[in-house]
From Swiss-Prot:
Function: Component of the coat protein complex II (COPII) which promotes the formation of transport vesicles from the endoplasmic reticulum (ER). The coat has two main functions, the physical deformation of the endoplasmic reticulum membrane into vesicles and the selection of cargo molecules.
Molecular functions (GO terms): SNARE binding; zinc ion binding
Biological source species: Lodderomyces elongisporus (strain ATCC 11503 / CBS 2605 / JCM 1781 / NBRC 1676 / NRRL YB-4239)
Pfam families for the chain: Gelsolin, Sec23_BS, Sec23_helical, Sec23_trunk, zf-Sec23_Sec24
Entry binding sites for Zn(2+): C262, C265, C284, C287
Protein name: Protein transport protein SEC24
Region entry Disordered, spans: 1-48, 80-111, 792-812
Localization of this protein: Cytoplasm; Cytoplasmic vesicle, COPII-coated vesicle membrane; Endoplasmic reticulum membrane; Golgi apparatus membrane
Amino acid sequence: MSGRRRAYPQPQYSAAAPSGISSPPVSQFQQQQQQPGQPGQPQAGFQGAYGAAAGVPAYGADQLLGQFQQMSVGNGAAVGTPQQQFQQPQYPQAQYQQTQQQQQQAPQVNPQLSYDPYQPQPQAGIYGQGMGGIPPAAGVGAGAQPVASYGAYGQASNLAGGVQLNALYTTDLSRDLPPPIAELSYQPPPITLADTATIIPGSKTANASSDYFRSTLNVVPNNSSLLKKSKLPLALVVKPYNALKIPDENVPVTCDTVISRCRRCRGYINPFITLAENGRRWRCNFCNLLNDIPSAFEYDEISGQVKNKFDRVELNHSVVEFIAPKEYMARAPQPIVYVFIIDVSVHAVSSGLTGTITRTILESLDRIPNENKTARVAFIGVDTNLHYFRFNEGLDGTEIMVVADIDEPFLPSPGGLLVNLDENREAIEKLLYDFPSFFESTANQGFALGPALKAGHKLISNVGGKLVCFAATLPNIGEGKLSVRDEASVAGKPKEAKALLTPADSFYKSFAVNCNSSQVTVDLFLTSAAYQDVATLANLPRFTAGQTHFYPAWTSNKYEDVAKLSKEVSDHLSQDIALEAVLRVRGSTGFRMSSFYGNFFNRSSDLCSFPTFPRDQSYLIEMSIEETINKPVVYFQAAVLHSTSFGERRIRVMNLALPTSSKLVDVYASADQLAITNYFTHKAIEKALSSSLPEAREYLISRVVDILNIYRKELVAGNVSGASPLQISTNLRMLPLLLFCLTKNLAFRSDRVPSDHRAAALNNLGSLPIPQLIKSIYPTVYSLHNMPDSCGLPGVKEESEEDGNDDNDEQGVEVDVVLPEPINDSKSSWENYGLYLIDNGSELFLWVSGNVVPGLIQDVFGTENLYEIPTGKTELPEYSIEESEFNYRVRQIIGKVREQPDSIIWKNLYVVVGASSNEPIEISQQRDLMALRMWASSCLVEDKTGSEPSYRDFLTSLKSKVSQ
């Protein structure tokens, strides 16, 4: 096997159709040369850059709530172009057995008109000067003179507090084909504030990063009528943590326990307050009340040194964390506690779940957060009985205690069941090592999950913690017993959702609410090829701030299954979770937090309770405008009061300031299409569970129609007769695509889907952070056979202007593996001899086209026979870079795509061989292969899939709906 780089046949370039090259499409806007005097619209926008111990009294969330309320926490453009043909040495054509194809030279493109959808064109912004023959939107106006520009986002159409807001640029969806998917990785429209809006003028860290805190609208309507008219939602997306481990975040912490809050609204001091009375007092930006500046801001009583209050991190940074004094503690911070509830029925033992889980826990003991050596653990095995394990002090072994009374489960011992991990390490290790042997000859088919949950809750209700459940069997005995539902009679019918996706037993929700009151979270890891009623069981994590992890048809006989489950469980246990947490979001006067979405429980109208706060989920808060807003800027603040796993009480505060406007044009010009997609996803889930799946799909499509209608009526200049009905602002042009693709997601699609799979998909969509959500809706596809030579190898960090003053000068230092530019989710972007990697957020598919050249599969798989490639769930053979550079690069890309610092998900790889004209009949008739091809192809969401139309057909249907 040669280690040299090969050059695989490149697709022909065609200006009329998409090619396999990872190049962005050129729309009619870019194809036409701008002519002075020609009616047109500038195409501009923002630049894409990512950039229970004995004697301890019970203390629950109700007491914590009372204490907390007393505190009143508040009211890309692709780098490739069509000219880029990667010049590499060519293999002899005979070796490839391919018909030689003549390469068509790419047409010359005016450099000024190269693909950059958010780069304003020279002279753009004046009616009659532009491209495409589409007049500017209202608010830009015929003959409007350019005033100024804000970065790359275009000209201002309005002033907010003396600051020019983002301009509106219109595009035609029917011309933006294929859709410019690079924009899915762009940052939201910039938030334009005056330098004087912050106490530190011009501060670049005063407003929260969209990774933590973002709004669906980056210009807020100043009254409810305008918001209703816009057909756009007003909501906040909150993700307080962006890494699984505390050291991986760069959030400043105030350590002096001095916390300054408004006396009236209880808002935290932040970068947007103003000073009064010679700096002795600060005016709250939420309620306008004057408050005293703490003396500790200017004088350190311990050291006797004078301090500069303007150096305080809470005045300089939008996201900060306070170490809280005792006044913020309802009780002393509790230790981190895990109760492992393990299925030991015959199904769990025979599938290997019991052995895999105990081995994984054993290997992960060092990863459990235990900095102060206070972590506690307990183990309960479950079949038709409850098997407790008592640790005897001073003894290496454990005693098994069996409780057969599952109707009234009790703790068989007053002590030794919940023990300190550090002090009992040897005994715990021995138990986990021996655990599978205790049940290896079982024939017990029962699984009393409900009684086990109640027993675990009783064990830790006075300290709180986590119940981590591993199940391979449907709960079939005791309280919470479930039965298999009749899917065949309702699948594909309007009543499917109510019959299959709503809870079958109220026990699980009521138990979850009780757990929340006791600061207990439930996490589920479900592994079975048979029905498990995910829709019912998912209530446990949903109301306790946990998560449901679903592994259909899992078996320990498959290495890849074991690897995925083990890695995800291990990463789950290693999270630096917060304990006994509450979240409250406040806004400026005139706003009300009306609805809350995510995995938690609302204990009051605006207080979200989290027994433990995970670091891999996000939350959405819908807002309503209660009165007219007369200020140019409004403010929002999210605060998470919590205890760390190492025993500190902390408050994480996030701040966001947004301009307001009375003009619809400004609202649309700064709308965040990804955050809006998140909002509509939550509403569609709500609609599906309360009504039906067809109504949820119709809800999504009708939202697109409403937005296009209002845009056409209000924002297309003069509502030009005969104008395309599919016009929308450039910053929202991915929204119709995303909502259309959401209807084809496993959670909502009209095709028949097993109810457990659909319920798991709905559950995941309701808690995913935005980047993972978008990938689940619109999978990322990479073309590997023609990727640039730099891809799959470490890149080099180049110093940018923003980095110029940084102390950390890493210019010329190797950094992360370079990935190819994504291509559109459509077979029209593929070649029949290509190699493609599909990432849908949960799995990876490596698609080997049926006419792939032998040299390519030799380099990747070590064989020239296409049908000798191992397909399905597998891993690639590992060759060194000297043995096969291409194999090495492909594996590096797969490894990079699997990296997710804020998620525990490990994506299995599925190898799929595409069909070809000379495919052997015995291959083409393999049911597993056909099913695998259909599964992978369903990720190509722009194409027609099953009974679902293509995106082009969807746009065609929209024209008639919008024109009506």
